[in-house]
Amino acid sequence: MKKPKVIITRRLQDRVEKRMKELFNVDLSSAEYPISKQELLSAVKDAEILVPTIGDKIDASILSAASPKLKLIANYGAGYDHIDIKTALQRGIIVTNTPSVLTTDTADMTMALILAIPRKLREGHEEMQSGNWKGWSPSAMIGMRITGK
């Protein structure tokens, strides 16, 4: 059975790329950043499935250049406002995303910031890295206590 042609617009985690290559005929960008519009226009000409990320603007011009075989845009991320959903649906292209994928990650980062910012962790780290730290003192890098707040 012929494997569907999948265009992946930028590098993903190794395990994801490996699995995709097992299941599909994959054309994988080696870039760690969004590909150019010209590269995207060229890539979609023979795609059956497109796997973009938030940095890839999938507008009407991209969808118009796409192969009639393009049936799925599997967005690698939660947001999808970079994809022209209306035009995709008019062309019979299903658009999916990964809702809630970042919910716990966002909560983790929020907790890290709640602890790091008032306690001046970034400033302390920079002082250590630059070699300017002179040692502990009663008033250095005290920051703000968050207990009870």
Where are these regions (language model features)?
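Phosphate-binding beta-alpha-beta segment of Rossmann-like dinucleotide-binding domains, i.e.
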Residues: R91, P99-K149
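An N-terminal-biased, well-structured beta-alpha scaffold segment characteristic
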Residues: M1-T96
